[in-house]
């Protein structure tokens, strides 16, 4: 590879996408054709009805967030109880790093998702994007590299003093 090619390959390339943040106070638009991500669903549920009563207990806020219609499919699926437990634990978490005290419920949720791959839609779990990336990549071909003759060691004679 020449110096120009090497310099060209060392320049980092970045791709940015401008996606608007999810609306925190309104339910999802039913006309939206793209499936929302898990993060946007959870953010919407956490903010669901937040402006109604600021003096409400953490337990009541967490329960109201769980009642958000935006996560109804997640609650009612085959891993619904594990999702509800993990989500409530996260919302009620008072740890400095939010949710770090909720390892067990999230491990249970992950185990359930692994045991039931169809528990949530692929667009919610992010598997859809990984599948697309795998399909886009061309198959890797194995190549046999043969070194040039000048790079090979010369045959040794029995009279060599090396």
Curated annotation (Swiss-Prot):
Cx9C motif 1, short sequence motif: residues: 79-89
Disulfide bonds: 68-70, 79-112, 89-102
Region Disordered: start-end pairs: 1-61, 119-162
GO BP: protein import into mitochondrial intermembrane space; protein targeting to mitochondrion; protein targeting to peroxisome
Extent of Basic and acidic residues compositional bias: 125-145
Motif annotated as Cx9C motif 2, chain positions: 102-112
Entry's localization field: Mitochondrion intermembrane space; Peroxisome matrix
Main location: mitochondrion
Keywords, sorted A to Z: Disulfide bond, Mitochondrion, Oxidoreductase, Peroxisome, Protein transport, Redox-active center, Translocation, Transport
Pfam families in the record: CHCH (PF06747)
Function summary: Required for the import and folding of small cysteine-containing proteins in the mitochondrial intermembrane space. Involved in the mitochondrial oxidative folding of the copper-zinc superoxide dismutase CSD1, the copper chaperone for superoxide dismutase CCS, and subunits of the mitochondrial membrane respiratory chain NADH dehydrogenase (Complex I). Involved in the peroxisomal oxidative folding of the copper-zinc superoxide dismutase CSD3, and the fatty acid beta-oxidation multifunctional protein AIM1.
Protein name stated in the entry: Mitochondrial intermembrane space import and assembly protein 40 homolog
Organism: Arabidopsis thaliana
């Amino acid at each position: 590879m020449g110096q120009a090619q090497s310099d060209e390959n060392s320049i980092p390339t970045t791709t940015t996408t401008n996606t608007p943040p999810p609306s925190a106070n309104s339910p999802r638009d039913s006309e939206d054709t793209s499936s929302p991500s898990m993060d946007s669903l959870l953010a919407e549920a956490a903010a669901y009805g937040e402006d109604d009563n600021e003096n409400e207990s953490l337990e009541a806020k967490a329960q109201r967030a769980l009642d958000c219609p935006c996560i109804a499919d997640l609650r009612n699926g085959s891993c619904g109880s594990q999702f509800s437990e993990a989500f409530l634990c996260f919302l009620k978490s008072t740890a400095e790093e939010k949710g770090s005290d909720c390892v067990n419920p999230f491990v249970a949720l992950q185990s359930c998702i692994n045991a039931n791959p169809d528990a949530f839609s692929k667009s919610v779990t992010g598997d859809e994007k990984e599948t697309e990336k795998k399909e886009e990549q061309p198959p890797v071909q194995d190549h046999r590299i043969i070194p040039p003759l000048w790079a090979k060691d010369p045959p040794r004679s029995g009279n060599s003093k090396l």
